[in-house]
């Protein structure tokens, strides 16, 4: 790798935070909060709540949840109340992916500036950043919910670069989603590490790896 790099900018969800483990932990919290509605053994309800997290699927998932619980004559909170509570419960139960904390600590000790650039609702993303335990490690954080643009708009990448005090050539962006993370970094002129299990670089990323731990060998 080009050792002129001075900063590493991370995506959050699916890059540092383990979505699956976080949803599982959040569902257990919902079971504790609403023991009459949710049960840890009810896998269908858990999957419907996961679908419900994505607002584009929320209405259909809510109806499906109502149908699923109907035989037990149970009444869900209103769609808006449940969407808000489930979203914040998920955010407050963020679980890091393997090697995430170790890698960020490694980069910090090596003197790299560390940035975070994430799309999403401001309140939820900030709650997630704090709950995952990495907040003190970042030199600069950009949440799209606080801005008039989001990934893959090059403008939000430039905002991250400016906050870190580096140029595009001096940064590496790390993410798991082609359309937002990798394409956006490319448009902004930033080298990228695509986290994927694929062996073929179909995204046109600068580097490929299965997890963020690869950075300890790249940098």
Where are the model-predicted features located?
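N-terminal helical cap/lid subdomain that shapes the substrate entry/recognition surface
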Residues: 2-98
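Short catalytic-loop micro-motif centered on adjacent basic/acidic residues
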Residues: 17, 115-116
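A short, structure-level motif marking secondary-structure boundaries and short turns
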Residues: 46-50, 87-90, 110-111, 141-143, ...
């Amino acid at each position: 790798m080009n050792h002129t790099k001075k900063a590493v900018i991370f995506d959050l969800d699916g890059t540092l935070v383990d979505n699956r483990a976080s949803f599982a932990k959040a569902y257990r919290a919902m079971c504790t909060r609403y023991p009459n509605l949710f049960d840890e053994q009810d896998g269908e309800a858990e999957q419907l709540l996961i679908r419900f997290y994505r607002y584009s699927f929320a209405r259909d998932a809510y109806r499906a949840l109502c149908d699923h619980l109907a035989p037990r004559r149970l009444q869900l909170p209103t769609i808006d109340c449940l969407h808000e509570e489930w979203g914040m419960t998920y955010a407050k139960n963020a679980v890091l992916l393997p090697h995430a904390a170790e890698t960020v600590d490694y980069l910090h000790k090596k003197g790299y500036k560390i940035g975070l650039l994430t799309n999403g609702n401001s309140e939820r993303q900030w709650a997630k950043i704090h709950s995952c335990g990495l907040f003190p490690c970042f030199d600069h954080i950009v949440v799209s919910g606080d801005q008039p643009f989001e990934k893959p708009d090059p403008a939000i990448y430039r905002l991250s670069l400016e906050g870190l005090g580096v140029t595009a050539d001096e940064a590496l962006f790390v993410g798991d989603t082609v359309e937002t993370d990798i394409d956006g970094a490319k448009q902004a002129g930033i080298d990228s590490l695509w986290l994927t299990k694929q062996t073929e670089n179909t995204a046109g990323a600068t580097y490929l790896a299965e997890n963020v731990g690869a950075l300890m060998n790249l940098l």
